[in-house]
Each structure stands twice: as C-alpha cells, then as structure tokens.
Amino acid sequence: MKRIEEEWNIEKIESMSTDEIFAKLNRLGIPVTPDDYRAAAQRHESGERLSEEWRAKYTLHPEGRYDEDFVWMAAIVLWKRLVPDRISFEQIDDLMQEGYKRLQSGQTAAACDAWWQVWKLIRDKVTPERNTLQALDRDFLGMQSVFNWCQDFEMELRNAGRDDPTYHRICISYCQEFLVAFSDEVLRK
C-alpha cells in the first residue's frame, strides 16, 4: 500500500539542520549557499519574498507534491538562523499573533506588552518608500493587515489602561509615533 505523502510545515523544517535544508533546496533546483542566502536577505524584508526571488530565478524540480511549500517555509526558517540580527516580517507576524493569543485568553496587558514590541519593529520598517499603511501591508503579508492591527492595538491599549494607567501613557506615545511614522498618509486625508 502506498503511503500518503505528508505536507511540509515550519516545525518539520525547523527540526532539520541548516545543511539538510540547503541540500533539499539544491535537489529541488535552487542552487543556493548560506552566503547566497545572506546576500539575498539584504534585498528583502521577508523570507517569503526572498523565496519569490528564487522561484523567478530558478526552475523548481519538485520531488514530491508539497515541495513548492518547502521552498518558502525553508526561506523563513533560514532567516532566523542566518540573519538573526534582522527581524523579518514573518517574525513580526509571529509576535503579533502571540499578542492575539494573549488577548483571546483574557491577558490584555500582556497582549499590549507584546504589541508594543511589534509596534517598535513595524516602525523600524517604515522607509521613505514604505511610509503608508497600504505600502507596509503590501510588503507585510501577515495573518492580520498592519492597518487592522494598528486599530486593535490602540483599542486594547485603552482597555488595558482602565486597570493600569501606564497603558494610557503608552497609547499616547503610540499615537504620537504613529502620526510621525505615517505623516504623509495623515496629511493626505
């Protein structure tokens, strides 16, 4: 009896060594090395976007039904290992989702603490070319849009501030920083 092929997932790829990941990528027709990866990462803010570059440049030779998924997931896993000093959009999204989990479990202040870190990371991704929420969302590709998350964060800071006024002060700082980061967008409205 033929065994059903298993799908790839991030956890399965995380359990592989870096050498095993590169060997698999090479077998799939993506002849990259760790140095190639690091160089490509300088042109991108996300592992998924980096994998799109590979797919445009190389012809994929899948060994199995789900190997196309391996490519983008491997790029995300390799980012954490090979470019630990640069936070990717996927890592920001992971922290954002952690905040939503905390919120769903009734931990509003803990969610806001995680999201304050998310905000600092997002703020650092704003550039002259990426200075609107629309432009940021175009690159972000997270589970939530940055546009929606910004509203959730502001609302939950106010909610957390009911129990601890520190969160009202954080909310004021967040709103001020938001206006500076997205000043072009604010002025256009």
PLM ranges: what are they?
Residues L25-G29, I122, F153, L157-G161:
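Generic structural signal for hydrophobic core residues of well-folded globular domains
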Residues K80-R86, L121-Q144, A160-Y167, E177-R188:
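Flexible helix-coil transition and linker loops at the boundaries of alpha-helical arrays
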Residues M16, G99, L103-A110, T166:
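Short helix-adjacent coil turns
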Residues G64-I76, A109-L133, D163-Q176:
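Helix-turn-helix repeat elements of alpha-solenoid scaffolds
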Residues N26-I30, E45-S46, Q104, T127, ...:
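Generic surface-pattern signal
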Residues M1-Q91, L95:
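Helical anchoring/docking segments at protein termini
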Residues L50-E52, I87-Q104, W116, F140-R162, ...:
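Amphipathic alpha-helical repeat scaffolds of TPR domains
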